[in-house]
Amino acid sequence: MEPSATPGAQPGVPTSSGEPFHLPPDYEDEFLRYLWRDYLYPKQYEWVLIAAYVAVFLIALVGNTLVCLAVWRNHHMRTVTNYFIVNLSLADVLVTAICLPASLLVDITESWLFGHALCKVIPYLQAVSVSVAVLTLSFIALDRWYAICHPLLFKSTARRARGSILGIWAVSLAVMVPQAAVMECSSVLPELANRTRLFSVCDERWADELYPKIYHSCFFFVTYLAPLGLMGMAYFQIFRKLWGPQIPGTTSALVRNWKRPSEQLEAQHQGLCTEPQPRARAFLAEVKQMRARRKTAKMLMVVLLVFALCYLPISVLNVLKRVFGMFRQASDREAVYACFTFSHWLVYANSAANPIIYNFLSGKFREQFKAAFSCCLPGLGPSSSARHKSLSLQSRCSVSKVSEHVVLTTVTTVLS
């Protein structure tokens, strides 16, 4: 996404592409007030956009910060997948804190108000965050694919994950340098350039018209089309491995056919029921691992799907604009403006959506989020949830003992 790029100047306002525009000195101040009142002051629907941006800003910053704190404060959550999730959250915090305010002001005022230096820095950081997000999601998919589909080919470790994260940032910072190099700030009303930054534009300047077509075609393929295609194939194989049919009689097949292992595992952990036999315990461990892998895979698939949907509109619009030259003389300019504005917002909404996904699809993250808010809402603390779970387990203990005896006897017979 390009936070500085706008579809064009406001309708009815003279631009540098038209006739020379001159104002008598006495009328400059009056003209600026006129521009602010009729063109720059937010319209009613733009106030809705501002509220949506503010909501995304707060949710993204708070949510992604809590994700980082949850992994940092809990050693049992420092898994390879969670390291990559933290890296994704850091990229979301970066783009939200630095790029979102600029995008909001550009979308509302259609003016670049931050000067020449930030005209290069902010779009560059935006491109870097996109690259980091795509590469991080790709490494997550690759790690899950190896762990589930080919566990003997590659052993993932936390040290390798940290090295991969450093490599992701190094590659992203390097390959996005051209984005900063081509960004320039200019005014569509040069006569007022020394009086105001209104109607200044931060946009790309290329030496030849062919270069942006090549660059943005490659950008779309490398940061969207190709990685999403590869990740889709990886998760398809993961889905088949975790939910597909298995050879009858194998342990994995038994895991799929046994529908209620959670009560027994929780009861054993709390010491409420008798301890099962060693081989049965191994089976229960595999049940737990299978269920955990399913939950993790489901969460990561949702994260990838939301990312693809949120980045699709701006990716397509940028290709249409930069590669095919559309929207330069758009007849219905308000519709084009609305499309670009909504697509910009969707990119930041993705940053806010990720912590929400973790909350609903990951029990560990949900407990940590509840613990973080427990100072304000004591009923949300993990201790309350644990007490409720303990009472529930005690009420089921007698039933669990009987079902455990029957199931474990059957499992032991089959596995012998």
Curated annotation (Swiss-Prot):
Q: Which regions of this chain are Cytoplasmic-facing, per the record's topological domains?
A: 68-82, 141-160, 236-298, 361-416
SMART domains from the xrefs?
7TM_GPCR_Srsx
What Gene Ontology terms for biological process does this UniProt record contain? cellular response to hormone stimulus; feeding behavior; G protein-coupled receptor signaling pathway; neuropeptide signaling pathway; positive regulation of ERK1 and ERK2 cascade; regulation of cytosolic calcium ion concentration
Keywords recorded for this protein, A-Z: Cell membrane, Disulfide bond, G-protein coupled receptor, Glycoprotein, Membrane, Receptor, Transducer, Transmembrane, Transmembrane helix
Give the InterPro entries listed for this entry. GPCR_Rhodpsn (IPR000276), GPCR_Rhodpsn_7TM (IPR017452), Orexin_rcpt (IPR000204), OX1R (IPR004059)
Q: Which residues does the record list as glycosylated? A: 194
Which cysteines form disulfides?
119-202
Output the Gene Ontology terms for molecular function: G protein-coupled receptor activity; orexin receptor activity; peptide hormone binding
Extracellular topological domain ranges are: 1-46, 106-119, 183-213, 322-336
Where is the region Required for response to orexin-A?
26-41
The record's region (Disordered) falls at 1-22
Q: Which CDD domains match?
A: 7tmA_OXR (cd15208)
What is the tissue specificity? Highly expressed in the brain in the prefrontal cortex, hippocampus, paraventricular thalamus, ventromedial hypothalamus, arcuate nucleus, dorsal raphe nucleus, and locus coeruleus. Not detected in the spleen, lung, liver, skeletal muscle, kidney and testis. Orexin receptor mRNA expression has also been reported in the adrenal gland, enteric nervous system, and pancreas.
| Localisation per UniProt entry | Cell membrane
Instruction: List residues traversing the bilayer.
Output: 47-67, 83-105, 120-140, 161-182, 214-235, 299-321, 337-360
Q: Name one GO cellular component term.
A: plasma membrane
Induction is noted as: By nutritional state, up-regulated by fasting.
Query: Site positions for Important for responses to orexin, renumbered to this chain?
Result: 36
Specify where it is mainly localized.
Answer: membrane
Origin: domain of life: Eukaryota
Which family does the record assign? Belongs to the G-protein coupled receptor 1 family.
Give the protein's function.
Answer: Moderately selective excitatory receptor for orexin-A and, with a lower affinity, for orexin-B neuropeptide. Triggers an increase in cytoplasmic Ca(2+) levels in response to orexin-A binding.
What is the UniProt domain comment for this protein?
The N-terminal region is required for orexin signaling.
Protein name, per record: Orexin/Hypocretin receptor type 1
